[in-house]
């Protein structure tokens, strides 16, 4: 569990222990099989008659409620800073000599207009080139429909959220624009678990017999929405269609928006509309250069597109900051295919046929492969830190095969942390955790009256879990959580990224010798007190950052 995934637990020392203590089970840990530090009231010290039991349970409920309300102010005093960097793995920047970057959604951020552009262009390609009904043009892009990390069952045409243990979060399964009832989902999958052989492959794709596709990058948001809209049209109009063909046609249309240059030309023609200038990319690059760090850029985007974007956000001298620039790299193939050589581009963008013996500063290279890159630069192992927004295409191979350190750029993190810092969210989550603990302890009472009370609590808990989901996204909830469990997205983020942050500008809050320490989160059989220290590194706490 990472810090963002466990922010409520991480907010203040003793918050969870105090919540557990509110349940009057002594130290609040005995119910989980953990020894109490001192004398504790037995769990079953309750009257035996039904009316007395009912009264006893509701007294415990009210006492826990009061105790929870007293906890909220202390939690509110330890809000997390949305501009902090969070660590999955201990890493010291003093060990990093070389910094690498992706381009899209790493060095440059785009406005909300870009996803509308991609959606509209792909929708029109479906109509004009794949002969889809012109009526689908009535569907517009909804930025609030989907979130990253969702899985799409290609054969059943349903979009869903899956947790780290391959379980579907019920209530987040959508066919078209309508939620699929839980009973139908359970019948469809013979439960809520998705077997490993049905999941997406290593890179999130539906290949080699896998029936699921995982949408991991930010550019996939309009693709998910378009898939859902066209599905909705066919369903509403009782049109028989093959879901596999629909998936492929939408995928090809989204790809063509990139491949045919539709997106690139539109951005270059109105760069101020599509590129957000606010992110302090130049300040980050200048800081690293001033400290003698080597820097390189590896992107799948074309040269002229990158040049115009970087000139806009960094300046026309942007290439002076980088030791190596590689465009149209075709990641993740760049990290695995040893056969493709580099090609140099001249100032006019013409590809040269010279054999590359050295990667020169100020030059732009196309394609190539990582093995040749390592040979020509000598930049190997944990001296290198590479940043990207795509967990699979940017980071997975680098950390698993080459030992590079990796940093994930997760723009959604900032908005989620701002929500998690609100009093309404903190009150709801604190009471939800307390109520869950109360249910866990009081389930030992099996008489009919007690069970009726517990059923009321379970109903309240279910309603609160739905409420916490809607804080982030009405359909799918948080990018990082499915109710109690981490999402499948977070599982991969935790595995492939040493650190993660909302944007590169977060680096400006730390010096170049800073060490990032991951929070020790308790295993189920460990004492919670071991992890309940306030984070002291960098600026994770909002109050500390404001004090500076």
From Swiss-Prot:
Top EC class per UniProt?
A: hydrolase
The active site lies at: 102 (nucleophile), 104 (proton donor)
Protein name, per record: 5'-nucleotidase domain-containing protein 3
Question: What InterPro entries is this protein classified in?
Answer: HAD-like_sf, HAD-SF_hydro_IG_5-nucl, HAD_sf, Pur_nucleotidase
Report keywords, A-Z.
Answer: Hydrolase, Magnesium, Metal-binding
* Encoding gene per record: NT5DC3
Q: Which GO terms describe its cellular component?
A: cytosol; mitochondrion; receptor complex
Q: Does the keyword Transport apply?
A: no
């Amino acid at each position: 569990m990472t810090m963002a995934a466990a922010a409520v637990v991480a907010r203040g020392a003793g918050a969870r222990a105090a919540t557990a203590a509110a349940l009057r089970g002594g130290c609040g840990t005995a119910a989980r099989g953990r020894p109490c530090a001192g004398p504790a009231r037995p769990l079953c010290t309750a009257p035996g008659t039904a009316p007395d039991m009912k009264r006893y349970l509701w007294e415990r409920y009210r006492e826990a409620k009061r105790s929870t309300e007293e906890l909220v102010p202390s939690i509110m005093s330890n809000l997390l800073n949305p501009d902090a960097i969070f660590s999955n793995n201990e890493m010291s920047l003093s060990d990093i000599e070389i910094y690498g970057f992706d381009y899209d959604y790493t060095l440059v951020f785009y406005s909300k207009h870009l996803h509308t552009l991609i959606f509209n262009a792909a929708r029109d390609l479906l109509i004009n080139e794949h002969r889809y009904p012109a009526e689908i043009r009535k569907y517009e892009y909804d930025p609030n429909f989907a979130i990253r990390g969702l899985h799409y069952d290609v054969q059943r045409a349903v979009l869903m959220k899956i947790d780290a243990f391959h379980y579907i979060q019920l209530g987040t399964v959508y066919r078209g624009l309508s939620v699929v009832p839980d009973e139908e989902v359970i019948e469809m999958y013979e439960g809520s678990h998705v077997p490993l052989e049905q999941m997406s492959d290593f890179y999130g794709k539906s290949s080699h017999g896998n029936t699921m596709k995982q949408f991991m990058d930010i550019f996939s948001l309009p693709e998910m929405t378009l898939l859902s809209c066209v599905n909705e049209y066919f369903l509403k109009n009782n049109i028989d269609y093959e879901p596999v063909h629909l998936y492929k046609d939408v995928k090809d249309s989204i790809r063509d928006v990139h491949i045919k240059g539709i997106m690139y030309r539109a951005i270059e023609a109105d760069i101020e509309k599509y590129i957000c200038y606010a992110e302090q990319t130049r300040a980050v690059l200048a800081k690293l250069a001033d400290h003698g760090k080597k820097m390189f850029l590896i992107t799948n985007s074309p040269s002229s597109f990158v040049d115009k974007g970087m000139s806009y956000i960094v300046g026309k001298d942007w290439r002076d900051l980088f030791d190596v620039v590689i465009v149209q790299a075709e990641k993740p193939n760049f990290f695995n295919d040893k056969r493709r050589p580099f090609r140099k581009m001249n100032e006019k963008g013409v590809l040269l046929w010279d054999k590359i013996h050295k990667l020169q500063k100020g030059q732009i290279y196309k394609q190539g492969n990582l093995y040749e890159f390592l040979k020509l630069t000598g930049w190997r192992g944990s001296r290198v830190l590479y940043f990207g927004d795509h967990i699979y295409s940017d980071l997975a191979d680098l950390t698993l095969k080459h030992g590079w350190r990796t940093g994930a750029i997760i723009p959604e993190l900032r908005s989620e942390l701002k929500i998690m810092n609100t009093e309404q969210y903190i009150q709801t989550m604190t009471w939800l955790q307390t109520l869950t603990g109360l249910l866990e302890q009081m389930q030992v009472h099996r008489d009919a009256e007690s069970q009726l009370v517990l059923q009321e609590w379970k109903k309240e808990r279910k309603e609160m879990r739905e409420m916490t989901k809607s804080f982030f996204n009405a359909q799918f909830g948080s990018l990082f959580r499915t109710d109690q469990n981490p999402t499948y997205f977070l599982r991969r983020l935790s595995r492939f990224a040493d650190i993660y942050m909302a944007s590169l500008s977060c680096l400006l809050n730390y010096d170049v010798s800073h060490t990032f320490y991951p929070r020790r989160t308790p295993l189920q059989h460990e004492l919670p007190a071991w992890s309940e220290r306030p984070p002291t590194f960098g600026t994770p706490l909002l109050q500390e950052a404001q004090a500076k």
